[in-house]
From Swiss-Prot:
Any one GO CC term of the record: cytosol
Catalytic residue positions: 37
Pathway in which this enzyme or protein is active: Cofactor biosynthesis; biotin biosynthesis; biotin from 7,8-diaminononanoate: step 1/2
Binding site for ATP: 12-17, 51, 112-115
Listed name of the protein: ATP-dependent dethiobiotin synthetase BioD
Organism of provenance: Bacillus cereus (strain B4264)
MF annotations from Gene Ontology: ATP binding; dethiobiotin synthase activity; magnesium ion binding
Binding site for Mg(2+): 16, 51, 112
Reactions this protein catalyses: (7R,8S)-7,8-diammoniononanoate + CO2 + ATP = (4R,5S)-dethiobiotin + ADP + phosphate + 3 H(+)
Superkingdom of source: Bacteria
Cofactor(s) in the UniProt record: Mg(2+)
Localization per record: Cytoplasm
Amino acid sequence: MSGFFITATDTEVGKTVVAGAIAGVFRELGYNVGVYKPLQSGHVASNPEGDAARLKSLSGVPTQENEICPYSIEEPLAPRLAMKRAGRVVKLKEITDYYNGLLKEFNSLFVEGAGGLAVPYTEDALVIDFAKELQLPLIVVARPTLGTVNHTVLTIAYAKAHGLTVAGVILSGCKECEMERVKENKEMIEELSGVPVLGLLPFFAGEFTKEEVLESAKEHIMISKLEEFIQNESNVAGAPSM
């Protein structure tokens, strides 16, 4: 399996923007990359304000929103609870089988979870159980400032305890006026976790375009390091899968 599992230290830390931006950059580089967010709460998949729509817009994939996210609920709750309150049952096998189906269309998939790794996800699994099924390297998206060292180091330790590989951390929402503290946090996360911080993505105020986000990702995220993971995972040695 090839791609990344994008998780976070919490909800609303910029996970969808990071996932969509990295996927969009990889597609510009010629990689046949798809995006997948199995479960979404807070918006139905077709809602332009939702994560599935944002993933589609930023990544540039041809996949429709309800194919990117096959299970979505309007109520903003943990996915398992939102599905239960709506009278729906989704099992781990269903979203894993769907992932395998998408791999027939794409060489690599960037999979976005929901919130953090311990979020109740399907009826029978947490987010981390799904990540373990896929065995993709993790990208951990985290806030850049106060509290992030603790949250990020704990997330990495939890992932490693479950046998998962953490490719790196991306601090999202970095403001210029806070960069001294952000860089200190970056150094502490790397020192305490042994995992590299691969990007300090700036804060986007108000509306933003796909072009702005992708250019920012190219400038502030170490895409070449992520490319190494994709190339090492794939059977196409040393070259993008077209």
